[in-house]
């Protein structure tokens, strides 16, 4: 009957709505956090760089199921995050409500994919022409002005690349949805 036909359409529209939400929420976070981390790592000592790069790539190299299970373990009713939040009087049953499960999927998506953006941006920062940065310094440019007028224009093709790759990947998210819901 009509009710049986409406159910698959409603499920499809709900999945489409969440996919669009996931895509448009995770993309800016991945770009901004990845770029800020790349800037930070670009300005630390060589010894610390290796550790930070290795540690930040960990979420990207583990399988999606293991990553989603880790998030599920941290946020389950008796997990670490609810335990810490209980000290502030906050009780959220993360796996019991649709909005909180969706939030966890979004958090997982940012955590899992951001290392890709970070490593692309870090590599891009290595190729920013030093003579352009030195010329800007001689001309009296501040750190912010060098970032805005020298570094960012050089990085824009990489920002577009990471954005397009993530937009394509965002429509293929299955494992975390299956594990976390």
Regions found by a protein language model. Give the residues of each.
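A structural signal for multi-pass alpha-helical bundles of membrane permease subunits
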Residues: 1-181
